[in-house]
Curated annotation (Swiss-Prot):
Keyword Plastid: yes
Enzyme class: oxidoreductase
Organelle transit peptide residues: 1-57
SUPFAM superfamilies in alphabetical order: Ferritin-like
GO molecular-function terms, A-Z: ferric iron binding; ferroxidase activity
Originating gene: FER4
Keyword Ribonucleoprotein among UniProt keywords: no
Substrates-to-products reaction catalysed: 4 Fe(2+) + O2 + 4 H(+) = 4 Fe(3+) + 2 H2O
Protein's name in the database: Ferritin-4, chloroplastic
Annotated ranges, domain Ferritin-like diiron: 91-244
Annotated organism of origin: Arabidopsis thaliana (Mouse-ear cress)
GO biological process, one term: response to iron ion
Amino acid sequence: MLLKTVSSSSSSALSLVNFHGVKKDVSPLLPSISSNLRVSSGKSGNLTFSFRASKSSTTDALSGVVFEPFKEVKKELDLVPTSSHLSLARQKYSDECEAAINEQINVEYNVSYVYHAMYAYFDRDNIALKGLAKFFKESSLEEREHAEKLMEYQNKRGGRVKLQSIVMPLSEFEHVDKGDALYGMELALSLEKLVNEKLLNLHSVASKNNDVHLADFIESEFLTEQVEAIKLISEYVAQLRRVGKGHGTWHFNQMLLEG
């Protein structure tokens, strides 16, 4: 069997020569390559199979224009706001997602405020648990950073940041039965779980509105970190329950201070 290509100025043909002289229609085997298949017999008695590429709808996507930017961008161009009060960057960003982001910003700031109050409490001279004060101060700063990250995202998507009221937190965290260290850490664990629940609700809003980018942002920037924080504080609660309110609390405080 011999395979050869024959070229001309207008087209090219691929010939298949079978020296056994078997006549067989192979056109069904090549539906996407050719619509014209010819069988011919030469002087030597050999059969020659040849096909020529022809223009069809199946090859338009390969050889024709599949994307016309100036034509397709026209509808987007018509939607570009002309008012200076409207965002130019906003695209497929629902009002519900925008409102949910603002609510989460408020959650992060409120939790940050509570942690800041706890930092001030444990930093008192008559409490003097500097390790716990350090931990809650860092936690407060972290929640504030989360709020700012959400604010940056809101602006990036073309939304409007609307800060809401922050509730005044408690200033006393003394607990007669548990002790202030354990009570404070249990409160922190509850707050972290609450923040995680709020983030999951925000993710649900993003999924409901088919906002893939927002969903990915929440997953990559918040959810993993939140789960890790819950695990860490859970361990701290378990350790404080084990050591009790006395000398063990002081050692736990030193661990946080030196960590």
